[in-house]
């Protein structure tokens, strides 16, 4: 048995072409359309987009870009909220070990902006989010939150 397996393996490795069998589709296109199930699209009451960056001007230009995208795709836009920045301060010594009176002061400010999109279907939301994620500027981070609409369970409806 082991000898047969070794001979099969050696013949497969020696041959330059591999024999692969594929099954041709024998289903008519009309029947194929019936097979595909129609799933209902998700509905979102709101999508909250939060984006952060260190440059205030970059966030402002990205905000105008998002507003223009909403206008052209006819997506209803909710509130635009500019949150206060987060300040991070780190004092450090100039020297490695001594000279405590010579210090450096490192500071970063993270500016935060939130934009809300209202009443969107799942396909529109995925297209919109893919487009804005492809065009996000360098140094800007994004966080997206969804609020999905779902029907009540049958136990509550009755």
UniProtKB/Swiss-Prot annotation:
This is Small ribosomal subunit protein uS10m. InterPro entries: Ribosomal_uS10_dom, Ribosomal_uS10_dom_sf, Ribosomal_uS10m. Its main location: mitochondrion. SUPFAM superfamilies: Ribosomal protein S10. GO terms for cellular component: mitochondrial small ribosomal subunit; mitochondrion. Belongs to the universal ribosomal protein uS10 family. It is found in: Mitochondrion. It comes from Caenorhabditis briggsae. The gene is mrps-10. Keywords: Mitochondrion, Ribonucleoprotein, Ribosomal protein. Pfam families: Ribosomal_S10 (PF00338).
